[in-house]
Amino acid sequence: LICSVYTPDGKPFAGDPRNVLRRMLDQAAAAGYRFMVAPELEFFLFKTDPNGNILEPHDKASYFDISTDLATHIRRQMARTLQAMGIAVEAVHHEVAPGQHEIDLRYADALQSADHLVTARVALKAVAQMNGLHATFMPKPIAGVNGSGMHVHQSLLDRDTGKNLFADPDDPYGLSALARHFIAGLLAHARGMCALLAPLVNSYKRLVPGFEAPVYISWGRTNRSALVRVPRITAGRYQATRIELRCPDPACNPYLAYTAMLAAGLDGIRRKLPLRDATEEDLFHVDPRARGLTTLPTSLGSALDALREDEVILEAIGPSIAERFLDARQQEWESYRAYVSQWEIERYLAIF
């Protein structure tokens, strides 16, 4: 059951993330926009023993492998399950890391997409369990391989006509001025909203160089090291124009994540923020200081500090959720900081 929460006097409950997203979507609608999104949901499948203990990745396959992909039938079962629940699936495939998979949900209104996403995470875990496996949306369960992200494709449509307002066939990137302001807003608030898009201590072990995850706050077309990517659109299909935000991970609350993205983009439109030049080279092999690039937060602690300083994002989620989210995440960060890991024991105990 998915619903919005109201107080006894009939007012939307301020602590309900679904109400927060609805409020932000109402603001967009008042400006003439409809916010559309499509998440790419990545996850790992692990083997389990008879007691349910998690063991190792289900297979040794990689991106779009066939012969070593042991979960083709499971992904098909997952897709059929979602579709039977009214959740449209765009694509399914094996991802880069062993045991890693991706299911892309079809473009939808942001509220419907968030509802589908929270449902899908539960459903996919259930299907995995029926096959004797454990599905995890932990961003980085295995060191040394790619982590699981949740890239979010997004665009604004005209509220009344459904026309894609991001499209401009005459622009070199196919982007309208509105889309450029929207991207500029995402870049301006990237640090401030990062804690909502990547909410775990573990999230920041995914956002490191070398594993196809964004680190630098930049945008480009074919550049998969950039934070925002503009997919190339076939001539004549301009209604499909969209941008892809690459830092979110599947552990996020989609209602809060979509709220933050939309708030950032609308702020860019409202202030007509200029969009810096695109970067198309691999940013992991350039001097970021020479390019004037800043980075995403490198830890949950620094992400929380950035959120505290971002008035636009704080206003979007509201003081009730902001206070509780910051308190809960800060407690997790402090617990992690105080924990002495096995890595530290093995590295330092004998030599100091």
How does the language model describe each region?
Residues 1-352:
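Glycine-rich, acidic/polar active-site loops that bind/position phosphate-bearing ligands
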